[in-house]
Amino acid sequence: TRQYEESKRSTFYDYNDLFPSLNATYKLNEKQQFRLAYGKSVNRPEFRELSTSVYYDFDLGSDVMGNSGLKAAYIQNVDLRYEWYPDNGEQISVALFYKHFKNPIEWTYTMSGGTDPIYSYINAKGADNYGIEVDIRKNLDFIGMKNFSLSFNGALIKSKVQFAAGTNNIDRPMQGQSPYLINTGLFYNNTEKGWN
């Protein structure tokens, strides 16, 4: 067993934020359009990220301590999308996206008196994510699968975090950010019988 220090300190956090968004659509014809979207969002620290209590993380195999000085991360999103609707219930879209993070929350670690690191959280200076996304939904009637449709979504993502000068972290991709995402699904929808 291991003895951990107990803290009775409490902290109050107060946030007053506005999150504007804008969506604009330009129709090329009845089946094709461009869509431009902007939005601002927030990623507030979780309780475990703020708590100065030390706990053992079995996945890391190490102690983890929160950081009560963490700030909320603010994200600005821009998305330019081309959409085509070839048939009822079908869609093909291609999007370019960009996200800028202010104060993103990232992992860091320090070496304790022994040789085991203690992991914690810090606010990086900023981060940028950008990439391309493809979204397809196709009815499968043409191969005899009436009422079935197949969906596919894939994205390629480039990510980079910038840390403040003087830290022991180097610029790298965001922690936990995959360089690609792939999703697919098979759907059944029978409006006559009310099944889906």
Residue ranges and their predicted role:
Residues 24-28, 40, 84, 138-140, ...:
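Residue-level signature of outer-membrane beta-barrel architecture
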Residues 2-8, 47-53, 60-62, 104-112, ...:
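Outer-membrane beta-barrel translocator domains and adjoining extracellular loop/strand segments
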Residues 1, 31, 41-45, 87-89, ...:
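Structural signature of outer-membrane beta-barrel domains
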Residues 1-29, 55:
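Signature of Gram-negative outer-membrane beta-barrel scaffolds
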Residues 42-93, 98-101, 112-139, 175-180:
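Outer-membrane beta-barrel signature, preferentially recognizing the C-terminal barrel domain
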Residues 13-15, 19, 29-31, 59, ...:
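Outer-membrane beta-barrel porins/channels
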Residues 97-100, 118-196:
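Gram-negative outer-membrane beta-barrel transporters
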Residues 1, 21, 25, 33-35, ...:
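Residue-level detector of the transmembrane beta-barrel scaffold of outer-membrane proteins
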